[in-house]
């Protein structure tokens, strides 16, 4: 007996950050039959793949309710170590935590301390702090799925093709004197939303 097998269908998923990565993750989770709650920092419309939309100041009320918590945050002064010991401990003990945003949003020593206590039903990290993860980092000693954070390095042809297509599209928009897409507000560290373009 390998223990209980959990299904994605019917799972409650909390997606923290609804930028490009969060949107793609949410869309897939919804398609697999999950109930999706999205967390944003600013009010706005609720995407069709999100069942409920809450703001960041409500996150502590939402963390204990999720089967899966997906962190899709950028690295900003406000998000650095946002997931500290206190917030991580608010997740359910059997919660699956996924970080596909930036490693610095999670306080690694706090994460390890909770793992020592048997917290988390699963942990999937595409990003870590520090990155790359040194061989002597305690995270290597746990049952954690660590994936290489390679999407930005053109290690996959599809990533390279996407970046080239985005650059060509923006070059054409520039030549046509149209607003550029994929802009980032340097002050906030967040992408400028489409409705502001």
Predicted regions and their residues:
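Residues at the starts of beta-strands that form the adenosine-phosphate
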Residues: 12, 34-35
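Glycine-rich Rossmann-fold phosphate-binding loop(s) that bind the pyrophosphate
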Residues: 17-19
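Rossmann-like adenosine-cofactor binding region
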Residues: 43-137
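Rossmann-like dinucleotide-binding domain for NAD(H)/NADP(H)
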Residues: 94, 100-197
